[in-house]
Swiss-Prot record:
The lineage of its organism: Eukaryota, Fungi, Dikarya, Ascomycota, Pezizomycotina. One of its GO terms (molecular function) is monooxygenase activity. This is Cytochrome P450 monooxygenase phqO. The keyword Oxidoreductase applies. Pathway: Alkaloid biosynthesis. Its cofactor is heme. Keywords: Heme, Iron, Metal-binding, Monooxygenase, Oxidoreductase. It holds the Pfam family p450. GO terms for biological process: mycotoxin biosynthetic process. Its EC number is 1.-.-.-. PANTHER family: CYTOCHROME P450, CYTOCHROME P450 MONOOXYGENASE AUSG-RELATED. PROSITE patterns: CYTOCHROME_P450. Belongs to the cytochrome P450 family.
Length: 436
């Protein structure tokens, strides 16, 4: 009897394994052969090769070379539209953002992306979290670690097939990300619980998220880390790129020092009004962003229903759509577009009809460094003041240049291009012309 039961169990197990193997084979064939939704009449590039299972090679090509791929046409499965469509998309509710999910002797100092983040985190943290948290070295380390590990992990997971995602919790990088999340929670939760218990409202992001949640359950630690991620990464990348551009153009630094000194002397200190009168500094930031934006395509949306644009272009439901930012290098809009010209937008301000579009924070269809439309970066005004204040201190207090024969490094990930943390500067202290 026991032998019979054992034989039956073994035979049944073999049948089950055969059944599972057959289903797995069918699923793999389906995943390989299933059609990818394509908009009729539009060219498609970067198709998966015949034996590129799960499109891993295709994903790597996109992650490493998306900007070049856009020059060839439209990338699939994301639909990249011409900037001509930006005005139609910017406020159309059918395109959903929510669904898209430095003395003569120089001393070597690294102008590291993540070291700059370490300087900007307390600044933004003071506004977002208040004095209780922003100066806590543990919070700074948790935020920096979450950013660094989070970016690497996100890029890694984009290459993996989605059916492997349940296994991600065991990936070493994912474990490191969770470690930083746990540390952030250890710091934030006592502050949040105390604030809620005392009913003390405050004008910071803790209260903002509670108000926006309107009683719905949410994870405040995730929310604060996401906000910090969005603000510190973009600010640090902006800082790194503009410092490198200035190091390559020392004559611009001389003119900027003069502008900063004159503005501070006029107003007595580094005020918001003084910053608003630094047109060359504003132009320098906008030009650096034009030449090296963080993203080469923006306005990422997902269509909630079928959409037919004004020229008859039909876009199916649930299509991931972006708008290319290539106008920022259009020679008809920006003469000699490959050249860094810090004075470009100062000169454009003299043209009356372009004057309002020349501010660093202006989001236009011809310069989408901050996006465009109702979802353009809401924190760009705060970030602009933050970066300008830091640059004023840097320009007045330090001299800097690039090491000889140092090539710039970048981190490429699809449409995103960040300055690499390996970039270094030669810097020394100088005596500033006016006290800040």
């Amino acid at each position: 009897m026991s032998k019979y039961l054992l034989m039956s169990f073994t035979e049944g197990s073999m049948s089950t394994w055969h059944y599972l193997a057959m289903l797995t084979t069918i699923w793999l064939v389906y995943q390989y052969l299933k059609p990818v939704p394509i908009v009729p009449g539009l060219p498609v590039i970067n198709r998966a090769e015949r034996w590129d299972f799960f499109s891993i090679k295709m994903k790597r090509r996109f992650l490493n070379n998306a900007a070049a791929l856009m020059k060839e046409g439209f990338e699939q499965p994301k639909l990249v539209l011409s900037p001509d469509y930006a005005d139609e998309l910017k406020n159309d509710a059918r395109f959903s953002l929510e669904d898209a999910g430095l003395r003569r002797h120089y001393r070597m100092k690294p102008a590291s992306l993540f070291k700059i983040i370490g300087q900007t985190t307390p600044i933004s943290g003071r506004a977002f979290l208040g004095p209780e948290v922003c100066g806590d070295i543990r919070w700074i380390e948790a935020t920096m670690g979450y950013l660094e590990m989070g970016v690497r992990t996100a890029f890694l997971l984009q290459v993996f097939p989605r059916f492997l995602f349940p296994l991600q919790r065991w990936f070493p990088l994912c474990r490191k990300v969770r470690k930083h999340i746990d540390m952030a929670g250890t710091i934030l939760r006592p502050v949040i619980d105390s604030r809620r218990a005392d009913g003390r409202p405050a004008q910071d992001a803790i209260s903002w998220f509670d108000e926006a949640a309107a009683g719905e359950t949410y994870n405040p630690v995730y929310s604060q880390l996401s906000l910090s991620f969005a603000s510190t990464h973009t600010t640090a990348d902006t800082m790194t790129k503009v410092i490198i551009h200035l190091a390559e153009n020392p004559a611009v630094v001389t003119d900027l020092r003069k502008e900063v000194v004159e503005a501070i002397a006029k107003h007595g200190e580094l005020t918001k009004t003084a910053l608003s009168q630094m047109n060359l500094l504003d132009s320098t930031l906008k030009e650096s962003q034009r030449l090296e934006p963080l993203a080469s395509a923006t306005m990422n949306r997902v269509t909630r229903e079928e959409v037919t644009l004004s020229n008859g272009l039909w876009i199916p439901r649930n299509m991931y759509v972006l708008v290319s930012g290539h106008r920022m290098r259009d020679p008809t809009l920006y003469p000699d577009p490959e050249k860094f010209d810090a004075y470009r937008f100062v000169k454009m301000r003299e043209i009356e009809k372009k004057k309002s579009d020349c501010a660093y924070t202006a989001a236009t269809v011809d310069h989408m460094g901050f996006g465009y439309g109702k979802h353009s970066c809401p924190g760009r005004f705060f970030a602009a003041h933050e970066v300008k204040i830091i640059l004023c201190h840097l320009i007045l207090k330090y001299e800097f240049k690039l090491p000889e024969d140092q090539a710039r490094t970048y981190l490429l990930a699809g449409f995103f291009t960040s300055a690499g943390p390996e970039n270094e500067l030669l810097v020394r202290r100088r005596v500033e012309e006016i006290a800040l």
